[in-house]
């Protein structure tokens, strides 16, 4: 068997509708589009969200919230990401290892994943669950 000899089982695939190919095909003349009107024309359909001139729902509803610029400077680090780092882990070590973006000003370790080895954190914020996991693995946190 070769890829070029594989074919679907007979009758399992319907043949494509060939529209506008004569009266005998059943899809000639208007080709299933009906008579006149916007949807009978080439390119004749409205853009997504258009409601026929009525103010669209997206514009009727107010804008909500904002994106904090502070969040761009604070990064979260998962527990399993610490396993690949050696020595004392501080913000500079996290940036150097590309665990957090270079413009990060603060980092916080969150309890996600597993930590098998002992690590020492310095000057990095830690959640309660992450603190327990680090200490359970034999690590320590220096403020």
From Swiss-Prot:
Residues 1-51 are annotated as: Disordered. Binds to the 23S rRNA. One of its GO terms (biological process) is translation. This is Large ribosomal subunit protein uL15. Keywords: Ribonucleoprotein, Ribosomal protein, RNA-binding, rRNA-binding. Part of the 50S ribosomal subunit. PROSITE patterns: RIBOSOMAL_L15. Pfam families: Ribosomal_L27A (PF00828). Belongs to the universal ribosomal protein uL15 family. GO terms for cellular component: cytosolic large ribosomal subunit. It comes from Thioalkalivibrio sulfidiphilus (strain HL-EbGR7). GO terms for molecular function: rRNA binding; structural constituent of ribosome. Residues 21-31 have a biased composition (Gly residues). The keyword Phosphoprotein does not apply.
């Amino acid at each position: 068997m070769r890829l070029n000899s594989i074919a679907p089982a007979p009758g399992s695939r319907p043949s494509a509708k060939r529209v506008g190919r004569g009266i005998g095909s059943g899809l000639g003349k208007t080709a299933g589009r009906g008579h006149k009107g916007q949807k009978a024309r080439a390119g004749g359909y409205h853009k997504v969200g258009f409601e026929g001139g009525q103010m669209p729902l997206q514009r009727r509803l107010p804008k909500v919230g904002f994106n904090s610029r502070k969040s761009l400077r604070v990064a979260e680090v998962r527990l399993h990401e610490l396993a690949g780092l050696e020595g004392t882990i501080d913000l500079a070590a996290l940036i150097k290892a590309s665990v957090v973006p270079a413009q990060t000003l603060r980092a916080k370790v969150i309890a996600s994943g597993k930590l098998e080895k002992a690590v020492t954190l310095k000057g990095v914020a830690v959640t309660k669950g992450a603190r327990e996991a680090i200490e359970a693995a034999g690590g320590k946190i220096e403020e």
